[in-house]
């Protein structure tokens, strides 16, 4: 947050959202995560990754990567059902505000590889209360050269939907689902010549070009260089340029 020079970090394992100063020291501030989204409510490795802050409304936004235990089986190859995530907002005071049902796409992969992850990994608030939500499918089969990722970015407008009631049962989520519009989609894959496999997990605003076009940045997590000498993940920053507005 530029207003107070704090860096807010979401913890995928412990479900805490904590503030730090730019020198790395704890700021002793934390968002009040509801028990329904707490550590015991998530499937391991599918907790909070996405975290964004809307400066216009002074609102934090977060969501778990995949479904909560209470909402059924996570979305994965062979699941055969729709999954809805609970998109949660917080005020600048750290207290929870409204939550909304986000409809997660079903995976494209037919089977899980040795390493697999799927779900929402980033949220980027836009002007007018809009949110860009990035979904990522990461699949590494036994044959590493077939490893690939699929990225999809959607736009949702929570203000145009209906907030979830307090403690809604999972079967109600579909009737509250937000409408989402596609923004962009692309894939990366491992290959011997010019490999571009990237585990993108970050999305943020970049610089504005001289002709007025916006840029946005995708940040890849290499998981410490996961893989072997020939086939492994790398840290990437991908620059995307919005179409020129006529």
Regions found by a protein language model. Give the residues of each.
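Sequence/structural signature of beta-propeller domains
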Residues: 1-246
